[in-house]
């Protein structure tokens, strides 16, 4: 029997500047195959039949978002971007709550500069976590040998990679649980770099769902070059 995929909201925090790219604009607005990275990141969600809507968190002075065709898509709402990722995601969740979204609704948070999400990975995440009491995230088992460095940049230890995973997105949690976890982290001055970290801090254990390793986040110029070469091969 085919499992019915759950309905969900998508949240895209897109208020960062991506300083390591050393580009003339925030990295989510760099071009890849005729569209911005942000547009590609949105596409997989906008084409999904169980999507309830999307919230994109944008900086107040962002001059690029209004020029995108997707900015006028009625399925996409804009929330205020915050100082950190957690602030931007929390603002998006507050917007959903203001529109009477339920605490039990699923929310998928995805990086604005992670444009190569496969539909098969999205469906696997939704299917595997549909009945999970906590939620979880796409991730990839560590493949390379890992080294721990000392203060002088020398190897202090080789890390056992057998239980190490790289955290990817989307990350999928219930609206109410994620809202509470992020709010508590901010009040307690706990720095979290992804949503799973906030859920972990609240005492829960998110589930890891193995995804494709090519669902990379664009962080440095070579990441974008790799994707451009891959896109060119699709023609």
Curated annotation (Swiss-Prot):
It comes from the Bacteria. PROSITE patterns: ISPD. GO terms for biological process: isopentenyl diphosphate biosynthetic process, methylerythritol 4-phosphate pathway. Pfam families: IspD. The keyword Electron transport does not apply. Pathway: Isoprenoid biosynthesis; isopentenyl diphosphate biosynthesis via DXP pathway; isopentenyl diphosphate from 1-deoxy-D-xylulose 5-phosphate: step 2/6. Gene3D superfamilies: Spore Coat Polysaccharide Biosynthesis Protein SpsA, Chain A. It is an enzyme of class 2 (transferase). The record marks 161, 217 as: Positions MEP for the nucleophilic attack. Its EC number is 2.7.7.60. The record marks 20, 27 as: Transition state stabilizer. GO terms for molecular function: 2-C-methyl-D-erythritol 4-phosphate cytidylyltransferase activity. Keywords: Isoprene biosynthesis, Nucleotidyltransferase, Transferase. It catalyses: 2-C-methyl-D-erythritol 4-phosphate + CTP + H(+) = 4-CDP-2-C-methyl-D-erythritol + diphosphate. PANTHER family: 2-C-METHYL-D-ERYTHRITOL 4-PHOSPHATE CYTIDYLYLTRANSFERASE, CHLOROPLASTIC. Catalyzes the formation of 4-diphosphocytidyl-2-C-methyl-D-erythritol from CTP and 2-C-methyl-D-erythritol 4-phosphate (MEP). Belongs to the IspD/TarI cytidylyltransferase family. IspD subfamily. This is 2-C-methyl-D-erythritol 4-phosphate cytidylyltransferase. It comes from Pseudomonas putida (strain W619). The lineage of its organism: Bacteria, Pseudomonadati, Pseudomonadota, Gammaproteobacteria, Pseudomonadales.
